[in-house]
Amino acid sequence: MKSYLLEIGCEELPPKAILTYKEFLKEYAHQTFKDFFIYNSPENIKIYATPRRLAVLIKNLKKKQDNQKITLIGPPYKVAVDSEGKFTKAALSFAEKNNIPLEKLEKITTEKGEYLGATIEKEGESLELFIKHKIPQLFNQFPQLKSMKWNNSDYRFPRPIRWIVSLLDDKVIEFEVASVKTDRFTHLHRFMTKPIGRGERKDINHANDYEEITKLGYIIANFEDRKHSIKTQYEGFARQLNASIIEDDELIDEITCLTEFPVGIVGDFSPEYLTLPKEVIITVCKHHQRYLNFEKDGKLIPKFLAFSNNAVKDRDIVKNGYEKVLRARLEDALFFYKEDLKKKLDDNIEKLKGIQFHEKLGSMYDKVLRNLELALKLADLTGYKDAEKIKRAVMLSKADLLTEMVKEFDELQGIMGMYYSQKQGEEEEISKSIYEHYLPKTAEDNIPETNLGTLLALADKLDTVISFIKIGELPKPSADPFGIRRNAIGIVRLLVEKEIDLDLRKVIDDESILDFILSRLESYLQSKGYKTDIINAVLSLKDGNIYRNYLKVKALSQLRNLPDYENVIMVFKRVGNIIPEDFKFSNVDVNLLVSQPEKELYKKFIEIKDKFKRFIENKDYDKALGLLLELKPYIDRFFDNVMIMVEDEKLKNNRLSLLKEINDLFRNIADFTKLIGG
């Protein structure tokens, strides 16, 4: 079994590059080397990612690919063989071009007809040659991130590449990228081995030695191991302080990206800063210093945890340095807080006219007025009665953008508006809605707790999506600068998770915008594990009610659990498929129902129709589907015993009209013809 090691040594990579490239390397290694693995195992591929290195160790590799039998297709058989059964010039040319002995040529039948061809055995490529050919190509396939050039090679990468290790077992596989030739040496920790600043240059004798060599050189090369070390230290210090950690996987990931040998150091700050809102202290620590906080009984304690990238000898000096920097930041925050409290949020409302929302969409004040119009309309549609409370909350919702605190820490928008409005005596629901109207900020974020906050959040997100799409600012697959996709997902989550029965067509007059939001609902439903065919069957009907669409998908998914699901779907699909697209519907004429099965089917249809519609109106889709299941045996008998496409036009159209009425019931839930099965 062979092992291959690739290490790309760089100047300090930014966290985004580390997080992106480690996932890319894993997928690349899996796809590229899949024909060389002796057996499939998670241990076949190990990824290493630190600020100074990206590496992949691939184990359990064969020396060469297995030989493969492949079929080569040549000219059509009638062109390749003449009437006497001899090979024509076309056949001989095909054989010569592909180095195929004439006796190997044979007739091959395909879907497109008969051809001359041959089945040959292709020699598997050697692992060494494969690596030499394939790995240099990898360097041009990294995902596009902000990059730079640093020499005359014209190669671009987020940071300069300083060394490349390429080892097949103990042999260097030679190639060159960005004027850097592959070798067997790596560099150990920049500050814990000599020379300081560069780190000891260390030869790797065998690919499998990589992890041990880096570990002895004060490098935890494996990202997850390093992250685990950081979390373990955080939890350990919390126990020592009789406190709790504050879960923040994003920050811990970032610290993991900034260190090769993380060493935690607990620092202190003055309790006077605890007069600041909790979120302010956490924001200062997280976004400006990458410090972690501790809490006890839900309240912060005046301690923080910083991580050094090496085991410093004099921790007190480093600790004092961390504390000094944080003290200055918190002092600024306290000053901003006190200054902001001297002013009323109301004074900022008019000043929003001076903040541009977008050059084609006016000022932030214009945005607030649009939000207000939408919020009042949504309130009318959803039954929220207090219009004055809505007006007050919406007008204050963006006022904190002009506070000193939010100017300095824009992550605190909404949060500071909540605290400042509380201080100036606003109703609690209004204050909370100022914060909540930004929720959810991500696909995993919390949603608003209050009805007012939900209303404001929905209005704000709808305005953003509607406004930007109307001016042609659609998100690109790789970029969403105005947060349109994120806001659309927020709309979906609010409507589904707050169970809001709202037809978006009552607030959206552009089908392309509704389609965009429905596409986000599709993604949301897929993320919840629902089957694609069920989602398509429901969403293809273009119902503008997001919550009802969700309930329909949920109910249909339960139907899939029936033992005879396949048979049920086959019958329901047949109803929809048999009706011609250009069929002109007319009411069923009971006098034209001549056979017993069609009379019984119509009678059962009439029996359940009104009850079915009540279930649909009440969003009870499980019971509605139950009624449709009651129709199935009658539909079965109808199809088994009644000829539909008869010569008598009146009889034929009457039977099609009956099926059309039944299919219209089905389409209150889904287009069953789009379901897979049956």
Curated annotation (Swiss-Prot):
Q: What class of enzyme is it?
A: ligase
What NCBIfam families does this protein's entry cite? Answer: glyS (TIGR00211)
Which UniProt keyword terms apply here? Aminoacyl-tRNA synthetase, ATP-binding, Cytoplasm, Ligase, Nucleotide-binding, Protein biosynthesis
Record's GO cellular component terms: cytosol
The family annotation for this protein states: Belongs to the class-II aminoacyl-tRNA synthetase family.
What EC numbers are recorded for this enzyme? Answer: 6.1.1.14
Protein name per the record: Glycine--tRNA ligase beta subunit
Q: What species was this sequence derived from?
A: Sulfurihydrogenibium sp. (strain YO3AOP1)
Please tell me where this protein is predominantly located.
Answer: cytoplasm
Molecular functions per Gene Ontology: arginine-tRNA ligase activity; ATP binding; glycine-tRNA ligase activity
Subunit details = Tetramer of two alpha and two beta subunits.
Superkingdom, natural source: Bacteria
